[in-house]
Amino acid sequence: CAPMTRAPRWLTYSGEPAPGRPKMARTPSGEPAPQAPGGAVSPVVNRLVDPISRQVAAFQGEWAPLLQAWAASDAGRRLIAHVDARLAAGAIIFPAQVFRALALTPLSSVRVLILGQDPYHGPGQAEGLAFSVPAGQPWPPSLRNIVKELQRDLGCPVPSSGSLEAWARQGVLLLNTVLTVRAHEAHSHRGKGWEEFTSRIIQAINRQPRVAFVLWGKPAQKFAESLDKRHLVIESP
């Protein structure tokens, strides 16, 4: 592993669920019940149900002004109309909670931004946090690579779950360059307008005091040149 891909020594988060988090509720049939915004997403409900427009209107928190300003822009309106129209036509789109990363990691708490490409496109995988999968799901190769790097660099133990919610609650913004994807169609929503939204988020974080940016893949690395030199920037293929 080249030096530029190594994790900073102070990145010592555990992959375990956050202390005190309640167990997932279940329906009488034994299936996981839908969770409130910001909560864990069951494999049964990880497909998009609520239109993007509704999720934008309902979003609260520090990111709300930025999100609403983007949604009112030409690029935002086009993207929302595109995704909502496909959803209404019956397309299966992931994840269910598109803005979950922003809900769990407010701007003022961001210490690390891990930027990926687009959500996992298989059933039960994407849960609104880049690289994270719900507990009990097999780990995709990208997640295994992240854990392997943390083991090698920091000696972190292998977590029991592929959920990275604990990281998000400790200031690690787990963001993809593109926030939605059609089932079994990688990169299907690339170039539709999400990149402009991601750029606004990165600009906001770039104005913060020192932050570590971990840019995973070429689409993410396109943002490297716009980052202030006071930040730590780590790039990985």
Over which residues does each language-model region extend?
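C-terminal accessory regions appended to core domains
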Residues: 10, 46-51, 64
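Extreme N-terminal basic, low-complexity initiation segments
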Residues: 1-12, 16
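Cationic, low-complexity basic patches in intrinsically disordered or flexible, solvent-exposed regions
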Residues: 17, 32, 116
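A polyanion-binding, active-site-adjacent surface
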Residues: 61-227, 232-237
